[in-house]
Structures are given as C-alpha cells and as structure tokens.
Amino acid sequence: MILPTIAIIGRPNVGKSTLVNRLCQSNDAIVFDKPGVTRDRTYQNASWGGKEFQIVDTGGLVFDDDSEFLPEIRTQVFLALEEASLALLVVDGNQGVTDGDLSIAKWLRNSSCKTIVAVNKCESTTLGISLASEFWKLGLGEPNPVSAIHGSGTGDLLDLVIGELPENNIRDDEEKIMMSIIGRPNVGKSSLLNSICGEKRAIVSDISGTTTDSIDTLIKKGDNYWKIIDTAGIRRKKNVKYGTEFFGINRAFKSIDRSDVCVLVIDAVDGVTDQDQKLAGRIEEQGRACIIVVNKWDLVEKNSSTIYQVEKELRSKLYFLHWSKMIFISALTGQRVDNIFEHALNAVNQHRRRVTTSVVNEVLKESISWKSPPTKRSGKQGRLYYGTQVKNKPPTFTLFVNDPKLFGITYRRYIEKQIRLNLGFEGTPLILLWRGKQQRALNKEVERENIEVIQKD
C-alpha cells in the first residue's frame, strides 16, 4: 500500500522527533536534548481511526544560517514537503512565536500543501490553550496545543490529521523486502542510497557520522517493493560517545536484525578493517542474507586482473561471509548500482528457500560416497543416517548421526560445501544441526516418515 504522507516540520529542538514517536507509538526517531539530531528525513508508519499513513520526520529548519549541515537539512525538508499530503508545523509553546517560526510559516503559506499547527510543550490543558492562542499570528489556521511527552492533545490532533488526508488509492499486497545498507562511517552508504533512489534522500558529506539515524526509503523495482534502510556508520566502541551517535549505532544494529538482506558496503580504497569484520560477524550471527558491495571502485587503478586479486584479498578477511555475492560499484558514477537489486533479490529468495527431504538426502548420499565420515582412533566411525530441512530464514538443516562428536569441523565444512555446490544457497548463511540418534528411535522415525537411511550401523 502506498500511504499518504505527513511531513513534520519546524525549528530545531521544538520536539518534532518526540511527537513523531508519540504519534507512531514507537521510539524509532532519535530523541536527544540537542539541536540538529535529526538531519535526513526518516519515515514511520502510523494509523488512527482505521486510517493508515506515514509520517516523515525532518531536521530542524533554519533559513538564515548556512553553517554545518543546515543547507543540506533545508534540502531534505523541501523534498519532504514536495511529496507530502499534509504538513504538520511543530512550534514550542513555552518559547512563543519566534522569527524562525514566522519564516517557516511564510514559506508554508506559499506552498500548495495543507498545514496544521501543533503547539508542543503544552503540558497543562488550561495553560496550553493560552499558550497556543499566540500562534494564530502564523496565518495557518487554528493552533492545536499538544504535549508530545505526556500525550495530551495528540488524539485531537490525529483526528484533524486524518480528516485532511486523501484516501489510499494505490494498493499493493506484496510483501516489502527489507534491505539495510550497513558499513563503517564514510564508505558511501548515503551516496549509494541516493544513487539507488535517483534523488537526494540522505545528506552526503566527507565528514564521518553525517547520518545519525536509520533512514527508511520505500521504492519499487520490477515487481517488488523494497524498504531500504540507510544506517549510521558503525565505529569502534571506544570512539563512540554517548548521545546521538550512540543511539544511531543501536538503530543500525536493530536494522540488521529486522532486515531480509543486508548490503555490507566496503571501501575499495581502504579495504577491510576490523570494524568491517565485526559487522560481517554480526550479520552472520543474526542469520541474515547478505551481499557485499565494494564501493569507490572508480578510484582504484586497475588492470585486467585487479578485480580478481582484490576480491581474493577481501574474501580472505571477510571469511564470515564466504557465501555472499561480492560486486564492485561506484555510487558516485552509478556503475553497477542496478545490479544490487538482482543479487539482493536472489539472496532473499535463497534465504527463504525450502528443499524437500528426499533432495537433501540425495546430496548427502553423494557427498558420503565421495568422502566417508571420519573414523576415530578407537575404530568407531561416524554414521550419517539422514538429513532434513527444519526451517528457513536462514535455511536450517538437522543431520541425524550416530554421534555428533565423531564429526569434526573439517567434515562439517565439507558437508556444508557440498550442500551449497549442489543446491545453491548463495547469499544466505546455512545452519547445520548435528543430532545424535539411537538406533531404536531412528528406526521408528524412519518408518513413520518413510525416509531412506543413507548409512546403516
């Protein structure tokens, strides 16, 4: 479903993100008592009175200051208003009307977007009415007192909001594919997001840490809707101070956890760092599908063999993700960026894939014929009775054996490699569970499930 959009607009530190969290009943927007925490525009879904919509949180809008990221934030706010069905101007009731509020109100009056004024920080109902009355001078209609922290007045505000929203007239019942863009600071994640979307959705800067939140973007490619999450860069813990970056990194880790597929971005010039390896380990631990994107490939001097040498070197350090597809791109020029969706979709499909027990056992039987299970010094040999896939996301197989201790790491890796060679599963981790089974219990299960035993005692 393509939802109507509400753009949250206002000066820095008037409580926009707190109000977003209140209206969406979530904590996804980073809230910190410091101006400029929100920089890019971020999206969350919400519903009220049986009507669904999405809210876009924007950075603090300042017209008369071009320092730091303020010009880029202005661009993000302008883009948010262009796509919005409704603007919600948030002001600070305790501070009263400021020159900044008047400038924003003038800009909104000149736009074609309907605007509702929310007077925040009105903790008392009686006092709130008095505080809100001053904001009639903005010329945007009746001001509405609310408290984002305590929730008072937000129900009435939402009633007004849904009354102004258009009907949802575009529907798509297909499931959205969640794809997170993961990487160290300044490897080009936001540039990649902008290249993918064909517009400036995230602020791009040479300064590390430009993205402090996780940015959700919904786009359609082919027959699929993709929800793309650009995350904050993840640095060493000792370099992370408590505050916006701390919260942003937590959001980034949560983005991995809720993703169908992760795009791990590596800097082609810098190569793989310790932090890249930790991110790779995190993706593997969470069992997520993944593709490795080597960005800034346009900056590398190369000949006909460079790509093979670089891939070999990178894979030797990203051994956690030996099963991931690796592609070399330039987010700046757009080189091979479109290939990301093809490989990401394949990884998602493999991550969700199921294989019948008969096919699994055909592969195991052939694998054993090429290389028998090891024999211990005591003369006891491992026996692999049969295997079956027990779940997907990621694909998980249970292999029933006489004694798991008889199967060392080398043979276990051999079996996983054979499963991949014969069945694919590129782009997704595999989990193999080795389970010991007594002969009596095995016979009952084999008879009940009509399974052919690969090896007998």
UniProtKB/Swiss-Prot annotation:
Keywords: GTP-binding, Nucleotide-binding, Repeat, Ribosome biogenesis. GTP 1 binds at residues 10-17, 57-61, 120-123. GTP 2 binds at residues 183-190, 230-234, 295-298. Residues 4-169, 177-352 form the EngA-type G domain. Residues 353-438 form the KH-like domain. SUPFAM superfamilies: P-loop containing nucleoside triphosphate hydrolases. GO terms for biological process: ribosome biogenesis. One of its GO terms (molecular function) is ribosome binding. PROSITE patterns: G_ENGA. GTPase that plays an essential role in the late steps of ribosome biogenesis. Associates with the 50S ribosomal subunit. Belongs to the TRAFAC class TrmE-Era-EngA-EngB-Septin-like GTPase superfamily. EngA (Der) GTPase family. This is GTPase Der. The lineage of its organism: Bacteria, Bacillati, Cyanobacteriota, Cyanophyceae, Synechococcales.
